[in-house]
Amino acid sequence: MAEIKTLRAVQPRANRPQEFNGLYQIPTLDEVIALAKSQSRLSGRTIGIYPEIKHSTYHADLRNANGRRQFGRHYFENRLLAKLHAEYGNSECAPVFIQSFEVGNLQYLSKKTDINLVQLIDADDVNADGSISLVPPYKQPYDFVKAGDTRTFADLLTADGLDFVASYADAIGPWKPYLVKTVADNIDRNGDGAITINDRRVDGSTGVLELAHAKGLKVHTWTFRNDASGYGFADPQAEMTYYYDLGLDGLFTDFADTGVAARDASTNTGSNIEACGRHGRHNRQHR
């Protein structure tokens, strides 16, 4: 920890402001929670946190020079839960979502906590026709690869796949092009003389969002940026509003002011968002 605290954050994107480089340390989970709670008190509204568990399978297999496991299975999951339960309680109404691209760690957590769990979904890219590009090693959760499970991220977005996800998670977090179909048809729609991802034709919902809601899962997606807009959209606020209008429950953006404006401009009233604890695995438990 002392070594990590010698590091300072820098802005990796050259087109963004650089004046804060070197001013701030890498925050710990304790510090993030303390900040969220203090700002909740100051603002009079609840500010949550959204931690991601990274590379559970890799860390579980990691060994030292003597061949002994350095951490073992579920070391980080257990430590995270101990902290979150101490700070927020073991409650489905806690202002917390725990996310992961792996499956096994979320299945383990689902037996240990009522805090909301999110199955992240990513792969390689999207093809020209808007379908999910499934290229190894990115096409599967890493724990599936290690276990010899042939299912891909795309399989998790089918009706059967979402039923499976809803057995242990409360929400899905697919990359945004997996929710809205866009097609590369070589038309310069914004007239800038170049064909980019912004020029892709928007063909509406892929159906994943609606199917996930039908399975009782919330849907969050990522990442929206003013300076790097997305597939089929040149205007970042219009892009986010489009997703909200489809019924999206939440999104990640580097530009919160644009995200709030997009949400407020949406026709989505939030009626698709059920009461606390009535989605995913919790929805099944309450039936």
Which positions does each model-derived feature cover?
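Metal-dependent phosphodiesterase/phospholipase catalytic core, i.e.
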Residues: 1-156, 160-161, 167-169, 174-179, ...
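Extracellular glycan-recognition regions
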Residues: 282-286
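C-terminal active-site rim and adjoining tail of enzyme catalytic domains
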Residues: 108, 112, 116-280
